[in-house]
Amino acid sequence: MSLSEEQVRSFLDGNPTFAHQYFGKKLSPENVAGACEDGWLADCGSLRELCQVEESAALFELVQDMQESVNMERVVFKILRRLCTILHADRCSLFMYRQRNGIAELATRLFSVQPDSLLEDCLVPPDSEIVFPLDIGIVGHVAQTKKMINVQDVAECPHFSSFADELTDYVTKNILSTPIMNGKDVVAVIMAVNKLDGPCFTSEDEDVFTKYLNFATLNLKIYHLSYLHNCETRRGQVLLWSANKVFEELTDIERQFHKAFYTVRAYLNCERYSVGLLDMTKEKEFFDVWPVLMGEAQPYSGPRTPDGREIVFYKVIDYILHGKEDIKVIPTPPADHWALASGLPTYVAESGFICNIMNASADEMFNFQEGPLDDSGWVIKNVLSMPIVNKKEEIVGVATFYNRKDGKPFDDQDEVLMESLTQFLGWSVLNTDTYDKMNKLENRKDIAQDMVLYHVRCDKDEIQEILPTRDRLGKEPADCEEDELGKILKEELPGPTKFDIYEFHFSDLECTELELVKCGIQMYYELGVVRKFQIPQEVLVRFLFSVSKAYRRITYHNWRHGFNVAQTMFTLLMTGKLKSYYTDLEAFAMVTAGLCHDIDHRGTNNLYQMKSQNPLAKLHGSSILERHHLEFGKFLLAEESLNIYQNLNRRQHEHVIHLMDIAIIATDLALYFKKRTMFQKIVDESKNYEDKKSWVEYLSLETTRKEIVMAMMMTACDLSAITKPWEVQSKVALLVAAEFWEQGDLERTVLDQQPIPMMDRNKAAELPKLQVGFIDFVCTFVYKEFSRFHEEILPMFDRLQNNRKEWKALADEYEAKVKALEEEKKKEEDRVAAKKVGTEVCNGGPAPKSSTCCIL
């Protein structure tokens, strides 16, 4: 049946799409040229040029759109619409590549684009996306293989999925699809569906497809790189600001998390987020366990963290960013609280997994509230939840983010950003844990110091042994005037002559420990510092008594040794005339340093502290015990009731503490050999001054030289037992040796090491020889130089020489005995050998050979 011209015209007017497609195909330059007469070739060529101009204009328009528009969807939409026309495809679609929970997928961004479509109709909103995992559908296969695919008949393609057709009531016949790549990474997949003017897409269509997709690829690359740049910028800002708040708040994990999360809220790109903090208790208290053991309560059967803790959220912090910003803190949240009711935070705390949920209301595993949470009408759409893990790989909390601001589900870049934040905050827990440990250690230290002070400090009854104010005045020392205390002390103290505290030959052997305390108090009065520096007399008594108690009850380095060193310092200053170089304040500090120089000594040396890995060795790098003695002395002086420096001004106090630092550290014999040459130069320098007064004036102003002399004085005081009269020195030497042998026993039993001869009890007989070596190698230089420096100190050097003679005589006597024993031993060995030979001859054994004859 033929159609009239009017009917054809009417049909074409009523079907513009068909007309456009039909004439677009029939009126190509080639077809028109073939239908034209020869005379029209020039005009037909002009028609071809006109089509090329139109094509160039279209390409120019695309380039212009790419340059002017930052909207990726708009540019790609125009490209797809143009492709539909050129390829004669029924429709085109754009699928964006993304990852969630570590699984790649493709989601529709532009769907069913036709030549006359509008962007608004084709742009897929986030809640209407069609999502293809990479193992489903042809687009998934394209993303996996990263190659263009031309499917001529989908019925014969094993990768085809009718999932989208069923959703849209559409029938797909053939497909041309290609990936958009950024290097080796897939960015998107573009697909053309159903060839209109043929059974399938041809190779020419593939070429055209590729040509136009160069523009799409460029645009999508720019979009992808821009998105990655934006994500990295946000990530950098998140880490920067969270670090700022983490290091600003080191004391409390809750405050640290809150400050960090609140500060970075603008960079998280979500409408709301909550942080659930987990109880870190691993073991229950006994009173919580008893009801379970008694059958009165059911044992916990709920989920646990990977390290075995019960999952208990003790606090939830809810950050609301949509509408009016708000923060809600929920201590001890109930199980049905909206942030916990879904079960997602509990699951994350149990498994440690990152969970990215695209459609919360349709999720079958977790029970999210479908309706609005509050009066604002806010609804949960998509969720990203992840654990906050500390450096010990313990889950300390769970952070959950709701509803990405642009409506799209959270992608892999969001996961990376949020994970960076939670990971950083998890590691920063180490700061608060360390602070908490330090705080506890500080508290324990304070408690330990208080306990030590309780046992060391002179109590109210002990002070009455020196200051009997109850018997004399009927009241406590604190209630007495200074003059009253001074009168009592004047009567109770022994005076300077009773125990010869001004003499180098002073011996403590005839004194009780309490008498030594009284002698120590007397030395301060003799120095004239009590009145000058306004030392409270009760404080002075308490200080000396407490120092005596702070020395341990060990063999040698006890209170008696501490007092002897202070007395020798006092004698060097007063009798040895070294006080002329020092002020009263400096003499005050030097005697105090002598009293404290070995306080709390353990009876073992520095080397043993290191070998036994004593905490002191870890606390102090060098001069281990000396630094401990110094710290202990300062600790006592820090107590107001013992602080004899309490009335010094700031500059005076700093000066005496500085001198104590030098004086006590100088008792380390390892430092003695470093300062010997410097001290000798000072002594030699003093001999260049004929006028002693000029030398005193010079040295008094030379701070460094005075400190070197003081340091050498401390060494002379520490070794002064070697300069006592022989009857005293011989006894003290045995005490020193006994303490050394005790350390040797510890090295042998505890450290399983062989001690050096000086500390070996089995070589006790070699003590005289060791003493001679010690005098020659260490002691002689000190006292020889001091006797050159001040002739008043010569008695110390003379007694040292005398003691050396005594030890040398004992050493020679021991050597003679050893030699005699060796000779006797050799004779005995010779007798045994001769007897053995005679026995062999009598028994018919071989006779000795003669050098002059031979017996046949």
UniProtKB/Swiss-Prot annotation:
<keyword id="KW-0007">Acetylation</keyword>
<feature type="binding site">
    <location>
        <position position="597"/>
    </location>
    <ligand>
        <name>a divalent metal cation 1</name>
    </ligand>
</feature>
<feature type="binding site">
    <location>
        <position position="718"/>
    </location>
    <ligand>
        <name>a divalent metal cation 1</name>
    </ligand>
</feature>
<keyword id="KW-0677">Repeat</keyword>
<protein>
    <recommendedName>
        <fullName>Rod cGMP-specific 3',5'-cyclic phosphodiesterase subunit beta</fullName>
        <ecNumber>3.1.4.35</ecNumber>
    </recommendedName>
</protein>
<feature type="propeptide" description="Removed in mature form">
    <location>
        <begin position="854"/>
        <end position="856"/>
    </location>
</feature>
<dbReference type="GO" id="GO:0060041">
    <property type="term" value="P:retina development in camera-type eye"/>
</dbReference>
<dbReference type="InterPro" id="IPR003018">
    <property type="entry name" value="GAF"/>
</dbReference>
<dbReference type="GO" id="GO:0001750">
    <property type="term" value="C:photoreceptor outer segment"/>
</dbReference>
<dbReference type="InterPro" id="IPR023088">
    <property type="entry name" value="PDEase"/>
</dbReference>
<dbReference type="GO" id="GO:0007165">
    <property type="term" value="P:signal transduction"/>
</dbReference>
<feature type="domain" description="PDEase">
    <location>
        <begin position="481"/>
        <end position="814"/>
    </location>
</feature>
<keyword id="KW-0472">Membrane</keyword>
<feature type="domain" description="GAF 2">
    <location>
        <begin position="252"/>
        <end position="429"/>
    </location>
</feature>
<keyword id="KW-0479">Metal-binding</keyword>
<dbReference type="GO" id="GO:0046872">
    <property type="term" value="F:metal ion binding"/>
</dbReference>
<feature type="modified residue" description="N-acetylserine">
    <location>
        <position position="2"/>
    </location>
</feature>
<dbReference type="GO" id="GO:0007601">
    <property type="term" value="P:visual perception"/>
</dbReference>
<keyword id="KW-0716">Sensory transduction</keyword>
<dbReference type="GO" id="GO:0005886">
    <property type="term" value="C:plasma membrane"/>
</dbReference>
<keyword id="KW-0862">Zinc</keyword>
<keyword id="KW-0449">Lipoprotein</keyword>
<feature type="binding site">
    <location>
        <position position="598"/>
    </location>
    <ligand>
        <name>a divalent metal cation 2</name>
    </ligand>
</feature>
<keyword id="KW-0966">Cell projection</keyword>
<keyword id="KW-0378">Hydrolase</keyword>
<dbReference type="GO" id="GO:0043153">
    <property type="term" value="P:entrainment of circadian clock by photoperiod"/>
</dbReference>
<dbReference type="InterPro" id="IPR023174">
    <property type="entry name" value="PDEase_CS"/>
</dbReference>
<comment type="subunit">
    <text>Oligomer composed of two catalytic chains (alpha and beta), an inhibitory chain (gamma) and the delta chain.</text>
</comment>
<dbReference type="InterPro" id="IPR002073">
    <property type="entry name" value="PDEase_catalytic_dom"/>
</dbReference>
<feature type="lipid moiety-binding region" description="S-geranylgeranyl cysteine">
    <location>
        <position position="853"/>
    </location>
</feature>
<comment type="function">
    <text>Rod-specific cGMP phosphodiesterase that catalyzes the hydrolysis of 3',5'-cyclic GMP. Necessary for the formation of a functional phosphodiesterase holoenzyme. Involved in retinal circadian rhythm photoentrainment via modulation of UVA and orange light-induced phase-shift of the retina clock. May participate in processes of transmission and amplification of the visual signal.</text>
</comment>
<keyword id="KW-0464">Manganese</keyword>
<dbReference type="InterPro" id="IPR029016">
    <property type="entry name" value="GAF-like_dom_sf"/>
</dbReference>
<dbReference type="GO" id="GO:1990009">
    <property type="term" value="P:retinal cell apoptotic process"/>
</dbReference>
<keyword id="KW-0844">Vision</keyword>
<dbReference type="InterPro" id="IPR036971">
    <property type="entry name" value="PDEase_catalytic_dom_sf"/>
</dbReference>
<feature type="domain" description="GAF 1">
    <location>
        <begin position="71"/>
        <end position="220"/>
    </location>
</feature>
<dbReference type="GO" id="GO:0047555">
    <property type="term" value="F:3',5'-cyclic-GMP phosphodiesterase activity"/>
</dbReference>
<keyword id="KW-0636">Prenylation</keyword>
<feature type="binding site">
    <location>
        <position position="561"/>
    </location>
    <ligand>
        <name>a divalent metal cation 1</name>
    </ligand>
</feature>
<dbReference type="Pfam" id="PF01590">
    <property type="entry name" value="GAF"/>
</dbReference>
<comment type="similarity">
    <text>Belongs to the cyclic nucleotide phosphodiesterase family.</text>
</comment>
